A protein has these predicted regions:
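Short sequence motifs at beta-strands and strand-loop junctions characteristic
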Residues: 3-6, 87-96, 159-162
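Outer-envelope beta-barrel architecture signal
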Residues: 7-9, 18-20, 93, 115-119, ...
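Membrane-embedded beta-strand positions in outer-membrane beta-barrel channels/transporters
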Residues: 10-12, 99-103, 166-168
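C-terminal beta-signal and terminal closure region of outer-membrane beta-barrel proteins
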Residues: 50, 60, 65-67, 82, ...
Length: 173
């Protein structure tokens, strides 16, 4: 796998019509792989490779005689089943609607009598949508290991971007 994205995507789209305007910013990466090794993330394998330290709903899909096609191996107190293999190579490509703003400029006839040159009302949202093939509890912007003093440093435990909504008024006198 290759943790360096082969392609980066950014698109800033905008349109306006009869006082209304909309702007949307998309960003993402394509062709990026991510190996979640034994010590790389507590969310995927459990902290320090111990599955019981962070049990979540996906960890319940482990091998048993009744579930031979499970995603995870049988939970054990060893790392033997969690060796490097393509089964656990994650697709870290994504596309995200990073920002969208919708606004309306009130007509001059309505606002000029109040000494206002321009009045714009808007609503904005950040991180409203994302599509990724990555494991569901990981944020593609916060993933990837890097070397720190010769050792791999965990970057999987960072908080993901928050979804934010804003409303406002711009007034020009």
């Amino acid at each position: 796998g290759n943790n360096t994205p082969r392609y980066r995507l950014n698109s800033n789209l905008g349109a306006s019509w009869k006082g209304f305007d909309i702007r949307a910013l998309f960003e993402g990466t394509m062709k990026r792989d991510l190996w979640l090794g034994t010590g790389s993330t507590g969310i995927f394998w459990g902290y320090y490779g111990q599955w019981w330290s962070t049990l979540n709903d996906t960890h319940l899909d482990y091998w048993t005689p009744e579930n031979p096609n499970a995603y995870y191996p049988t939970p054990t107190n060893t790392t033997r089943s969690r060796q490097t293999q393509t089964k656990y190579l994650q697709d870290a490509s994504y596309i995200r609607l990073k920002d969208v703003t919708i606004g309306y400029n009130l007509p001059q006839a309505w606002i000029s009598k109040f000494g206002i040159a321009q009045l714009r009302i808007f609503a904005s949202g950040q991180n409203l949508w994302e599509a990724t093939g990555l494991y569901k509890y990981l944020d593609p912007d916060a993933t990837g290991n890097r070397k720190k003093d010769g050792e791999m440093e965990d970057r999987m435990t960072k908080y993901p971007f928050c979804r934010t909504y804003s409303f406002g008024i711009n007034v020009t006198f």
